[in-house]
Amino acid sequence: MIGLVGRKVGMTRVFTEEGVSIPVTVVEVEANRISQVKTLETDGYAAIQVTTGAKKANRVTKPEAGHFAKAGVEAGRGLWEFRLENGEEFEVGAELNVELFNEIKKVDVTGTSKGKGFQGAIKRWNFSTQDMTHGNSLSHRAPGSIGQCQTPGRVFKGKKMAGHMGAERVTTQNLEIVRVDAERNLLLIKGAVPGSTGGNVIVKPAVKA
């Protein structure tokens, strides 16, 4: 399914004609340049590879430089891939822009969530705290029991515990497109999207719409 790679600019709000305030996230979508077209015959699946934005020449590795030169496109800040369906055809060097979403009402947005570092079970998994008083001296924010007894004699895999939180791939589904601004290459999406300001986000038509 074809989507677009953009950059999260931040949040603002827009007003409807009735005066209702709608919170929106602004996503800047510079032209997505197609750097490679993958086919069933050569790669085993059909997809397009895109890049967007710009990258300093001294930051482009030799393999990357060769790849972009072969495609005849300017080096971008990364490479992303979208699977093709229903025999869609694209050419290397072609550009995709926000007008792709002119007829689409709902989208799924994928980004990298904000990193929170090492966090306890209360913040990380929304556990309840234990008593602050009533004889409890040291276990106010402890998770509590983590298992049973000699049987099974171990802690099950996947047990929710303290650990690294955030900085992982997150998708928020069924977000509404409020406005497509083709002149300024902006998408205004209702509500919040994953990640920090300036982070890369992938916007695709909603799969559950």
From Swiss-Prot:
Look up keyword rRNA-binding and say if it applies.
yes
Tell me the keywords, alphabetical order: Methylation, Ribonucleoprotein, Ribosomal protein, RNA-binding, rRNA-binding
Q: What's a BP term from Gene Ontology annotated to this protein?
A: translation
Record's keyword annotation contains S-adenosyl-L-methionine: no
Pfam families reported in the protein's UniProt record: Ribosomal_L3
Query: Could you tell me which residues carry N5-methylglutamine?
Result: Q150
After translation, the protein is modified as follows: Methylated by PrmB.
Q: Name one GO molecular function term.
A: structural constituent of ribosome
Protein task? One of the primary rRNA binding proteins, it binds directly near the 3'-end of the 23S rRNA, where it nucleates assembly of the 50S subunit.
Which NCBIfam families does its entry note? L3_bact
**Record HAMAP family:** Ribosomal_uL3_B
Summarize the subunit comment.
Answer: Part of the 50S ribosomal subunit. Forms a cluster with proteins L14 and L19.
Q: What is this protein called?
A: Large ribosomal subunit protein uL3
